[in-house]
Amino acid sequence: LERPKIAAEMKDLDQPSRAVLRKYGVRFGAYHIFFPALLKPGARTLASLLWALKQDDVDMNALGGAQHLAASGRTSFPADKALSQDAYRVLCYKLAGERSVRVDILERLADLIRPALSWRPGTGAEKPAGAFDGRSFTVTQAMTSLTGSAGEDFASVLRSLGYRMDRRAPLPEAPNPAEAPAEAAAENTTAAENEAPAVQTEAAASE
C-alpha cells in the first residue's frame, strides 16, 4: 500500500493497533506499508499471476519479463510502458518515473534521505552524507547505487516520491581558526563558484 493514499486511515490507527500489525510482520515505512515476507520471488510471481487472472487486458509477455527481472533480484529496472502501475505494485515494485523500484529499496532510500534532511547547520552535530541546509539534501553515490540508477532516471524516482530538483550554490564553510583569514576567504569564494544540485521537500517519517 502506498502510504499517502491511506493517510486518513493511518491517522485513525493508534499505536497499540500498529504494534499488533507489526507482530504479524507488517512494515510501516515512509512511502509504503507492506509485508517483507511477500518480497520473496515466489510470492511475488504468484501474486502477479493471480492478479493477471482477474484482469481483462494484461500483456502477459510484458508481465513475464517483469516477473523474470523481479525474480533475478534486481532492485530496480526500466519500466515497461505496456504494464500498469498496479502490475508493478503486485510485484512489490513502485512505478517511479522511468524505472520500477522495489518498495523495500525505496524505504532504504528514505533511511538515507531522512538524516540528511533532519540535520541543521550550526548545531554542532556531525553533518551526514547528503545534508545541505536543513531543508534540502544533495544526491549521494549511496542513494544512486541503492536504486541502480543515476542522472535523469534517478531524478524521476525522486520526483515520483514528491521531491523536486533544484540547483544552488553550496553553503560557505566556516573558516578554520588555524587558517589565515585571507586563505579562508579564498576557499569560500572558490566553493561559491561551484553549483551543487539540491533536492527540496518535506521529509516523510517512517516507523
Language-model segments: residues:
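Long, low-complexity intrinsically disordered regions
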Residues: N176-E207
